[in-house]
Design a protein with these regions (language model features):
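Short beta-strand-centered aromatic/proline hotspots
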Residues: 13-21
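Intrinsically disordered, low-complexity, charged/polar segments
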Residues: 30-54
Length: 101
């Protein structure tokens, strides 16, 4: 249900899933990484109050698609803050993986 790159809700806060293994997820909550059971995550389905809906520039859209293609991740962000978080969290990892080919 949750894949790396997905946003989810944990303890009523929006988090991003970094990895999943053995029914656990490593999540990033702000700048804190932690591991939680997948069963403790909830689907992220509503734009947070006061956040702008997604209207990506061509460069942002290209970057998100490239990260997803390189890392096999799925972007499910709903607001512009999610776009920034996703790119900031995974861009360098994506570049390193592409260079390692």
């Amino acid at each position: 249900m949750f894949n790396p790159g997905n946003f989810a809700i944990y303890n009523k806060k929006r988090v991003i899933v970094l990895s999943t293994e053995n029914n656990n997820a490593e999540i990033l909550d702000g700048s804190i990484k932690t591991t939680v059971p997948l069963s403790k995550l909830e689907s992220y389905t509503k734009i947070p109050q006061g956040m702008a809906p997604i209207t990506m520039s061509a460069a942002q859209e290209h970057t998100v698609k490239a990260i997803c293609a390189t890392l096999g991740y799925q972007f499910n962000g709903l607001c512009m803050h999610d776009v920034s978080t996703f790119i900031g969290t995974f861009k360098e990892k994506s570049i390193q993986k592409e260079r390692a080919k």
